Swiss-Prot record:
Keyword annotations of the record: Cytoplasm, Histidine metabolism, Hydrolase, Iron, Metal-binding, Zinc
Purpose: Catalyzes the hydrolytic cleavage of the carbon-nitrogen bond in imidazolone-5-propanoate to yield N-formimidoyl-L-glutamate. It is the third step in the universal histidine degradation pathway.
Annotated Fe(3+) binding sites: H70, H72, H238, D313
Catalysed reactions listed for this entry: 4-imidazolone-5-propanoate + H2O = N-formimidoyl-L-glutamate
Localization (cell): Cytoplasm
Organism: Xanthomonas axonopodis pv. citri (strain 306)
UniProt xrefs under PANTHER family: IMIDAZOLONEPROPIONASE, IMIDAZOLONEPROPIONASE-RELATED
Protein's recorded name: Imidazolonepropionase
Binding site for Zn(2+): H70, H72, H238, D313
Length: 401
């Protein structure tokens, strides 16, 4: 069999769902043709392969490229000053009253043009790519007006054009109530003006809603979901981060790809997610940065068979994190997730959370050839070490980059 590129003398984490766990192969090879994997598995069982190029991995580990399935990467401004203020005793309410918080990011993002937003976002993206990310979701939500939301989504698309990475755009117009507006009239605008325009331009694949007592109600979230489905967009939700608004249960009824945060999720929400196949996206960076104490119900989610994905939640206010490797360590340390769960959370289950499990997140024939090649002794090193980047090479669609 002819192939374009062959990686051999490697140890593999295939993340093959059928095999379960990490799907470890001790003496493995990965063969690629036209950007897709044609074989990934044991060298001893491989068909005869004639590669144009072969790479001796010298016993390095190969995993699927990492997938960050929840980010707010595109924004302008810097809120490090608020971090300092909180350390000195200021409350979130104090900061918001002084014009800070999400309003500060909205103000800066609205003021930035495409070029400025792109320049601000590229270093954050590059930091993720340097740790093996090959696909990431990027949400809007810092424009909170049609033209500015479109601008954010447009820049997200430009990021994907400028780097070898797949960008999955999500419309999060229902992130917060804009300054000077009221929630219901604004949600009406999201549903009747923003969603139709964004869907018509093909700028987003899904919608997201922040369903919380300080943002939007369950009824308002449902209004957004109905509008999204009418325009062919998939559904995600920020749910149960600060209180139990039963948002995850609602989203599951609408077939949501994922429910994210979910610290206050109850058993009814767990059952609804399990029945719908909705992925739990856990965000340990936000939990850490905000010094939260309410743990997501990991044991209940495991028992119910709900897939567990992880993400950085990169954003300027509650998780200024661009390191998936550190997020894995946080998930293990704070949430007591296993090594297998942490690595699967940034590969196989993250692909599921983005509706891409048919072609991303595993090493097997037919999948896109997105790889991360690691200088590690064992998979646990990816989760155990902190401030450590063992990436040897990143491969996107079969091309080293």
């Amino acid at each position: 069999m002819h192939c374009d590129v062959l990686w051999h003398n490697a140890q593999l984490m295939t993340l093959d769902a059928a095999a379960g766990g990490l799907g470890i192969v001790d003496d493995g090879i990965v063969a690629c043709r036209h950007g897709h994997i044609v074989y990934a598995g044991a060298a001893a069982q491989a068909p005869a392969l004639q590669p144009d190029t072969a790479h001796d991995c010298q016993r390095r580990w190969i995993s699927p490229g990492l997938i960050d399935c929840h980010t707010h990467l595109v924004y302008a401004g810097n809120r490090a000053n608020e971090f300092e203020q909180r350390l000195r005793g200021a409350s979130y309410a104090d900061i918001a009253a002084a014009g800070g918080g999400i309003v500060a990011t909205v103000r800066a993002t609205r003021a930035a043009d495409d070029a400025a937003l792109l320049a601000a976002s590229l270093p954050r993206l590059d930091a993720m790519l340097a740790e093996g990310v090959t696909t990431l979701e990027i949400k809007s939500g810092y424009g909170l007006a049609l033209d500015d939301e479109i601008k954010q989504l447009r820049v997200a698309r430009q990021l994907g054009a400028q780097r070898k990475v797949e960008v999955v755009p999500t419309f999060l117009g229902a992130h917060a109530v804009p300054p000077g507006e009221q929630a219901q009239p604004y949600i009406d605008q999201v549903c009747t003006q923003m969603i139709p325009a964004i869907a018509a331009q093909g700028l987003a694949e899904a919608v997201d809603v922040f369903c919380e007592h300080l943002a939007f109600s369950q009824a308002q979230a449902e209004q957004v979901f109905i509008a999204a489905q009418a325009h062919g967009l998939r559904i995600k939700i920020h749910a149960e981060q600060l209180s139990n608004q039963h948002g995850a249960e609602l989203a599951a009824r609408y077939g949501a790809l994922s429910a994210d945060h979910i610290e206050y999720l109850d058993q009814h929400g767990v059952a609804a997610m399990a029945a719908a196949g909705t992925v739990a996206v856990l965000l340990p960076g936000a939990f850490y940065f905000t010094r939260d104490t309410q743990l997501p119900p990991i044991a209940a989610l495991r028992t119910a068979g709900v897939p567990l994905a992880l993400a950085t939640d990169c954003n300027p206010g509650t998780s200024p994190l661009t390191s998936p490797l550190l997020a894995m360590n946080m998930a293990a340390t704070l949430f007591r997730m296993t090594v297998d769960e942490c690595i699967a959370g940034f590969t196989r289950e993250a692909a599921r959370a983005l509706g891409r499990s048919e072609r991303l997140g595993q090493l097997r024939a037919g999948m896109d050839c997105d790889l991360a090649i690691w200088n590690i002794d064992a998979p646990a090193d990816l989760v155990y070490r902190m401030g450590f980047n063992p990436l040897h090479a990143r491969v996107w669609r079969g091309h080293p980059c």
